[in-house]
């Protein structure tokens, strides 16, 4: 089925839903395709303490549900589907989805976000879903009263480790450097938690486990200085080493940087293709916060409105 629209929004995180709210209120009748992970990264986040407007801690999935309801209430059509292919060579732009629909859009706002990075070692792939995860809130429950290893040193790793203490008997966080990049307040919480221990200057060499039943039994880690390998016994391994932008759909059609983030013109959400805008983590490698994503979604919507009214 072919569907035409003035504004097509790809992605349903804070950037996409904010763009939807603003374009809907401008009477542009936006269509939003919510993608493989409706709600974006916040749907796998438990406590949200830093989103303005809430005096008390709120849950990520609840916050995204509220944004989605708000977008619908002001006139956004939200489609449960995912994009397989785009053609940005000329207007109207064409977007093809997994459900077999073809959309023709006068403008597009790309809000496809970013996804978890993996270690890219064979044993990680072997045990993914059998003790290896990149989502503590999704899978932490399965490791109640067990020992867990978290890999990473940024906000994500420290937050995952802190959350996992709600379930695990012990959490070991291993980092390739001798200090964390995480916010000071998060580090303070981590160092004060008796369930958490830290191993500095180590990288994962191999995840080991059993085949019957398929499960993780430990992690071999290597000292980056001495190259000595040691074994940490555990039942689960959570990878928290950052994210990569979801831009594969647009390769060769839109300007990106060396890390495959979409390049936007300074101070705007305009991309190298006139009529195509990008907002949120897909074009932001510095801040990557829900509130900045929402703000850039608003910017994109206002810029789309001006573009269509030219």
UniProtKB/Swiss-Prot annotation:
Q: Which reaction does it catalyse?
A: [thioredoxin]-dithiol + NADP(+) = [thioredoxin]-disulfide + NADPH + H(+)
Q: Which residues are connected by disulfide bridges in this protein? A: 135-138
Extra notes?
Answer: The active site is a redox-active disulfide bond.
Show the InterPro entries listed in the entry.
FAD/NAD-bd_sf, FAD/NAD-binding_dom, Ferredoxin-NADP_redctase_2, Pyr_nucl-diS_OxRdtase_2_AS, Thioredox_Rdtase
User: What gene is it encoded by?
Assistant: trxB
Binding note for cofactor:
Binds 1 FAD per subunit.
Q: Which domain of life is it from?
A: Bacteria
Question: What is the protein name for this chain?
Answer: Thioredoxin reductase
Outline the subunit composition: Homodimer.
* Catalytic class of the enzyme: oxidoreductase
Pfam family name, one: Pyr_redox_2
Which parts of the chain are coiled coil?
none
Gene Ontology cellular component list:
cytoplasm
Q: Where in the cell is the protein located?
A: Cytoplasm
For this chain, the family text in UniProt reads: Belongs to the class-II pyridine nucleotide-disulfide oxidoreductase family.
- Main site of residence? cytoplasm
Q: Which GO BP annotation is one of this protein's?
A: removal of superoxide radicals
Any single GO molecular-function term of the entry would be: thioredoxin-disulfide reductase (NADPH) activity
Keywords, comma-separated and alphabetical: Cytoplasm, Disulfide bond, FAD, Flavoprotein, NADP, Oxidoreductase, Redox-active center
Q: Does the keyword Cell membrane apply?
A: no
Q: Where does FAD bind?
A: 34-41, 281-290
Needed cofactors: FAD
Q: Known EC number(s)? A: 1.8.1.9
């Amino acid at each position: 089925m072919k569907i035409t629209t003035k504004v097509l929004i790809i992605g349903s995180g804070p950037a996409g839903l904010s763009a939807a709210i603003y374009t809907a209120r401008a009477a542009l009748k936006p269509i939003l395709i919510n993608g493989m992970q409706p709600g974006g990264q916040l749907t796998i986040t438990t406590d949200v303490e830093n989103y303005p407007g809430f005096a008390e801690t709120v849950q990520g999935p609840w916050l995204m549900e509220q944004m989605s309801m708000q977008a619908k209430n002001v006139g956004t059509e939200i489609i449960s589907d995912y994009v397989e292919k785009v053609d940005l060579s000329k207007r109207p732009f064409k977007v093809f989805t997994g459900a077999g629909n073809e959309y023709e859009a006068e403008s597009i706002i790309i809000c496809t976000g970013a996804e978890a990075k993996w270690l890219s070692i064979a044993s990680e792939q072997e045990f993914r879903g059998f003790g290896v995860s990149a989502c503590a809130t999704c899978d932490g429950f399965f490791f109640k009263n067990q020992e867990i290893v978290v890999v990473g040193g940024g906000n994500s790793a420290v937050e995952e480790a802190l959350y996992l203490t709600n379930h695990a008997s012990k959490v070991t966080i291993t980092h390739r450097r001798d200090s964390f990049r995480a916010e000071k307040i998060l580090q303070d919480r981590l160092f004060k938690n008796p369930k958490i221990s830290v191993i500095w200057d180590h990288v994962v060499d191999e995840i080991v486990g059993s085949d019957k039943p398929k499960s993780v039994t430990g992690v071999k880690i290597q000292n980056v200085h001495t190259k000595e390998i040691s074994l940490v016994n555990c039942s689960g391994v959570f990878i928290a080493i950052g994210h990569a932008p979801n831009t594969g759909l647009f390769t060769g059609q839109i300007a990106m940087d060396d890390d495959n983030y979409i390049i936007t013109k300074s101070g705007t959400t305009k991309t190298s293709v006139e009529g195509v805008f990008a907002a949120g983590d897909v074009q932001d490698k510095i801040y990557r916060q829900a509130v900045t994503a929402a703000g850039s979604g608003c910017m994109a919507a206002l810029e789309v409105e001006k573009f269509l009214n030219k």
